[in-house]
């Protein structure tokens, strides 16, 4: 497959404001690679345009193994590893969790995830998903790492698992999609709330109400690339620079200057994950 690399920054900057330092708290380098994007060249181009820190989220140990050299291509690349609910039906899930634990022991990962519960799709029986989620929460706790949580129509069960885990560093509710009245409960569990490109959709009224309930110091923004492209690019391949459209929408909804939002969200990511990693090659 031919590897594409262009970000089409001329189109992005022609349609919305671009401010260096914008972060992306959640993207999938290996899913982009599977779509024909060379993640190394993509990261180098993002760096040239002044993109801020990024969180590369692996959803299986196999994905994790493919990301080990990526920090050499981008200053400020955080790495996370976990077992996504989409992989909860695999027969070797216990072995996968053991491998995730060994990866975390290397000390080169900034978070555990993506993990969580998905009651919308029957990837595996609920009991299996819950066992895998709880095991990963325990790993996050034992390694003193934040957790990146996927929650699809499983609010109460996610909250109960987080309360039981009592994570020392909380984590991120990725691509938040819960009702507005759930925001406070997740904040109480030490979670940051991250919004993706779907908040730019004009129909996202409830999601926009939830946004307004998030304190400034607990807000994160993401792409979930290559998925969930923001308006007006809905349905097209997503990548981290497209987060600019989400920033513009969020700044408008919150009545905030865009530059102030960029600074605040970057500070929030650093407060949760620590100082951005150096531009050095890492194992994994």
Which residue stretches match the model-derived regions?
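Mid-domain alpha/beta scaffold segments of enzyme catalytic cores
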Residues: 1-284
